[in-house]
C-alpha cells in the first residue's frame, strides 16, 4: 500500500465526511478531524473557507491530486465552452484512473492510479501507464491478461458497496470497460455532495 493510499482515511477525517462511502471510514465512528485535538468545536466557515473546503474535498476524492495538477484541470475546464463546473467534473471523470476505479477493477482511486502506473491497463489495446490519461467516449479500457488474477482486482470486482455508473459499460468476467460518454455532475455517483460551482468561485476570486 502506498503512502498516498494509506492517507485516504486522513482525508475523510480532515473533511469530516466519508467521501468515498467506505464502510471502514473512521468518520463513521466519530465526528471530529484527525489529531489529538480534533474534538475542538469548529466555528462557522467564511465564504472563502466554504469554497476552499469544496475544492479540497473534490481534489481529495480523485486521489488527493496535487494543487498544480488540479489547477491545470480547472484552467482547461474554464477555457472550454459551457458550464465550467460541469466541464470540471467531465474532465475529472474522463481520467483513466477514475474510470478504472468506477469500473470496480480496484478498491480505491489511490489503488487505481497505482494500478495504471504499473502498466496493468490498456486503452483500445495499447498499454497506458499514466493515471491522468484522458479517455474519450467509446474508448475501451481492459485489464491486461497477466494482471487479471491479481488479488486486488479479484477482491475489487467482488465488492458490492458501490455500483458502476451507467456511462461506463463493464464486463467483469472479461475485465473490460467501455467509456460510453463524458458524464455530467448529476450522473456521477458521489457518496457525498460535491459542489464544483464553489470550486469555480474559489479560482475566480
UniProtKB/Swiss-Prot annotation:
Belongs to the universal ribosomal protein uS4 family. InterPro entries: Ribosomal_uS4 (IPR022801), Ribosomal_uS4_bac-type (IPR005709), Ribosomal_uS4_CS (IPR018079), Ribosomal_uS4_N (IPR001912), S4_RNA-bd (IPR002942), S4_RNA-bd_sf (IPR036986). Part of the 30S ribosomal subunit. Contacts protein S5. The interaction surface between S4 and S5 is involved in control of translational fidelity. NCBIfam families: PRK05327.1, rpsD_bact. One of the primary rRNA binding proteins, it binds directly to 16S rRNA where it nucleates assembly of the body of the 30S subunit. With S5 and S12 plays an important role in translational accuracy. The lineage of its organism: Bacteria, Pseudomonadati, Pseudomonadota, Alphaproteobacteria, Hyphomicrobiales. One of its GO terms (cellular component) is small ribosomal subunit. The keyword Ribosomal protein applies. HAMAP family: Ribosomal_uS4_B. This is Small ribosomal subunit protein uS4. Residues 1-16 have a biased composition (Basic and acidic residues). It comes from Rhizobium etli (strain CIAT 652). It comes from the Bacteria. Residues 94-157 form the S4 RNA-binding domain. GO terms for biological process: ribosomal small subunit biogenesis; translation. GO terms for molecular function: rRNA binding; structural constituent of ribosome. Residues 1-46 are annotated as: Disordered. Keywords: Ribonucleoprotein, Ribosomal protein, RNA-binding, rRNA-binding. CDD domains: S4. PROSITE patterns: RIBOSOMAL_S4 (PS00632), S4 (PS50889).
